[in-house]
Amino acid sequence: SSVALLGLGNEGHWGIAHLCCLWAGFYITTHEHLVHGRITFPSGFSNPTEGLVLVVATFLVLSVSPRCLEATVVDGVSVMGSAPVSLRAKHCLVLSEAATVLLTLVKNVWKMAMHKGYLRPNMSLAKAISYLLPLATVVIMAHGLLLERGPHRLTFVGLAACANLSILMLIICEMTKSKFPAVYVSLSFVPGALAVWVLGDAALLPFAVLGLLRLAGRWLNFQRELVHYCGMDGPMAVQRWPEKHPNKQRLKDKIPWL
C-alpha cells in the first residue's frame, strides 16, 4: 500500500484513492461470494488476483521510472464547452479503478434486489447490504481525514489497517459461513478516526499503531483457529488430512471467537 502513496506523486490523496479502489474491489467480490456463493468478475480490477498483479506492476514500473505516473495523458481538453481538463497517468489509473468498483457494486446490488434466489438461504437483502457497511465507513473516513488533515503516511497506514482488518474478517466469515459483524467492525474504526479529526497529528501515530496491532492480533487468532480447523499439529506442520477429505465432524465445529 505504501508503494501507491509514495509512487503516485506529491498528491498523496491519489495514493489513498488507489488503495481504497483496489481494496474495495477485493471487498465487493468477497462480499458477493459470502452472500451469493459464487464470484462473477467483470473486466477491470475487481479480481483480487488482478489487483495484486496491479500493485506489483506499479512497484516494478515506479522502481524503474519514478515519475512515469506524472506523465500527462490529456492536456487542456474541453468537453462540450466545459472548463479545460488535464489528466495525468495517475488520474487515469485511479479513475478506471473507481469506475470498475462502482459498476461492480451497482451490478451486485441490482442482482440482490431483482433476482429471486440470488442470495444464499437465510440471507436477506437488508443483511447483505448491511455487510457493505465497513466498506462505506472506510471510504467516508478516508474522505473526511483527507479534507480535514490532508494526506499523511500515518493516515494512509491507519486506513490500510482498517481496510485489511475488515476484509480479513469478511474472508473468515465467508470461509466458515458465519454471520459477519458488520456494525461492530465499522464502529470499531470510528474512535481512531475521531481522535485524528479532533487531535490532529498527535493522534496519527496511535491511530496507525493500534490499527496494525488489531490487524496482527486478528491474523494470529485466525491462524490458530485455522490450525484446529485443518487438524494440523501446529502452524509450521505439513498439512495431512486424517482421511482423503477433511474431518467432517471438525467442519461442524463452531469457532467461538467469531
Model segments located where?
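C-terminal membrane-associated helical module and adjoining short loops/tails
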Residues: W23-L258
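Multi-pass membrane catalytic core of lipid/isoprenoid biosynthesis enzymes
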Residues: S1-A24
